[in-house]
Structure formats: C-alpha cells, structure tokens
C-alpha cells in the first residue's frame, strides 16, 4: 500500500500546498480521498497515474471537491471506459451533481454517485473493505477507513519438511489454504504447519473534523492515520469553533487509538514554513513510531503490521 499526498493545505492553497487530496494505491487499485482544486495537475506532477476507481469525498466544502469536474473531464479526454464511483455523505448527491453539471461535463464512461452514512460499509471486497465513520465538521461529513482482512498465517516450511517429512510440492499449497493432507499414513492438519492469521493493514482518513470518539474507534491500531491539523495549540478554541483540530489534539487521539503512524494534514496558511512547530507539538504527546506534517508530493509505503 502506497499513500501519496497530493494536497495538504487548509481551505486556502499556497505555492507549496494544494487543497486536500490523498491517493492510495493498493495492489494495483487507486483510490482518491477528496479532490480539491488542482488535484489532477498534482496527479500528473507526482506521476500517480489516473486509473482511479473510487473517489471518497469527506464533505462538500470547495477545498475538498472543486477538483472533481476537471478530473472527470480529463478522464473523458483520455478515452476512459471503466466506471468511476464517487462516494459522498448522505444528502449531498444533488449538490455534487450540480457541481459537475455546472461545467457542462457529461462523462461518456459510467459515473455513479453513492451516498454514505457513518457506519456504512462503502466497499466490501474479497480482501478489504472501506468503511465510513462519523466526523464533526460544520456540514455533513464522514471519514473513511480502508481495512484489509486478516491474511493467512506463516507456513512453517522447515517443520513440514524436516519434522513431518513432507517434501515441497502441492501438499504445501493445500495446507496453507487450510486443507488437511494425507502423508505417511496419517492426516496432517493445517494448524500443525500454519501459524495464526496475520492482521492486514488499516488506513484512516478523517477529512475536516473536530476530534471525535468515532474517529478514535475507526483508527484503533491503524497503521496510518491521516488526520487534519489545521491549527497549532494556541488556537485550540478557534479550532473547536470552526470544526477543526490542533496538531496536539490529533496526536492525543492517535495515542488513545494506538495508531502506529500519524500524518498531519490540512495545514492552515498561517503556518507556512512552520511545519516543525506542529510536528513538535504533536510529537510531545504521540508515542507511536512517527508523526509528521505531510507535504505535497510526499509518498510513503504502509507495510504490513508484521513486516520485518
């Protein structure tokens, strides 16, 4: 899983930061979380590719959606034929449709808009799911968690070969798939050579929000939490009034949730060139492996929890 930050600014862009957008690539699929103005140019600039199958919108403030019409048009110009799904908070479909129609854009490829509520399983695939959770902003909003299923346990090849005398071959595959096999006159059960299931990865994206219990629950043991941090701690009151979070508050929430890595984004223009200040405020309370203020174009790999 690779996460590329396309836009990390607050409501107003700067020369260094574009409005909100994060692209996640998982096993060849590409998911876009929010699509602020200029997102398609960022995709070109940072070579992420345009083969996005789903756009997950947290809310309909302009800095999170104004890039959608232009991206849809470019996909059309590129002769896209695959369907594209846009997921947005319940009750916002008509606004989203008006935004797209206002540009005169009518994609020739299938475009579907799905409305989601907190608690919905937005996507349910064989190896992962995307779930919506409640956030607290000044308008209808949700966050999203991409949660992978548990993986098979490790296969103990040494035990299979040396202790049980099973030579490498088809029986290994059957055992790893959970099927017992016959060998040397006895039945070998999978659990004899296969360890316990290993957890998949959890990626969580909040969009704009005050700190919430629902976010902490969705981010429990997350491998990467991308949480907004619009303000420094001396503006905590202002953050609450405007439906936002401070860097320290995001770190406190990440601590409670047992998050492994915390990326701070949606940085106000007042902190241009002051990313370290926000990092320092967050790292003073965050006990995970790493907290960082994300930059446009920054890409990080999210390893499996048991990766060495």
Residue ranges of predicted features:
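Active-site neighborhood of phospho(di)ester-bond hydrolases with catalytic His/Asp-centered motifs
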Residues: 33-36, 52-60, 89, 204-207, ...
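Metal-dependent phosphodiesterase/nuclease catalytic metal-binding core
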Residues: 117-264, 276-280, 284, 306-308
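Conserved beta-strand hairpin/beta-sheet module of binuclear metal-dependent hydrolase folds
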Residues: 1-48, 83, 144-146, 153, ...
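Active-site neighborhood of divalent metal-dependent phosphoester bond hydrolases
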Residues: 80-115, 270
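A short helix->loop->beta-strand "cap" motif at the edges of active sites that frequently abuts
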Residues: 80-84, 257-261, 287-289
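Active-site metal-binding motif and surrounding structural segment of the metallo-beta-lactamase
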Residues: 37-87, 115
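Short acidic, glycine/proline-enriched helix-loop-strand junctions
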Residues: 272-298
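Metal-dependent catalytic neighborhoods of phosphoester/phosphodiester hydrolases
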Residues: 67-75, 99, 272-281
